[in-house]
Curated annotation (Swiss-Prot):
PROSITE patterns membership: SNAKE_TOXIN
Domain of life of the native organism: Eukaryota
GO terms of molecular function: toxin activity
SUPFAM superfamilies for the chain: Snake toxin-like
Any further remark recorded for this protein: Positive charges of Lys residues are necessary for cytolytic activity of this toxin, but not for its binding ability.
The organism of origin for this protein: Naja pallida
The protein's assembly and partners: Monomer in solution; Homodimer and oligomer in the presence of negatively charged lipids forming a pore with a size ranging between 20 and 30 angstroms.
Family listed: Belongs to the three-finger toxin family. Short-chain subfamily. Type IA cytotoxin sub-subfamily.
Name of the featured protein: Cytotoxin 1
Keywords of this entry: Cardiotoxin, Cytolysis, Disulfide bond, Hemolysis, Membrane, Secreted, Target cell membrane, Target membrane, Toxin
Tissue: Expressed by the venom gland.
Record's GO cellular component terms: extracellular region; membrane; other organism cell membrane
Pfam families: Toxin_cobra-type (PF21947)
Length: 60
């Protein structure tokens, strides 16, 4: 699995076990990603932070 890093077009191949790509954004500024990368379990979104997870190459 390949996931985008914070600044596309840079990306990395995920290590074994981390089979989701994720993008973290602030709810106040949903178009500006704060963090991107590989993750094993999708974190829960909160009142301030939203997580978007997916499992195909560079989908974040």
């Amino acid at each position: 699995l390949k996931c985008n890093q914070l600044i596309p077009p840079f990306w990395k191949t995920c290590p074994k076990g981390k089979n989701l790509c994720y993008k973290m954004t602030m709810r106040a500024a949903p178009m500006v990603p704060v963090k991107r990368g590989c993750i094993d379990v999708c974190p829960k979104s909160s009142l301030l932070i939203k997580y978007m997870c997916c499992n195909t190459d560079k989908c974040n």
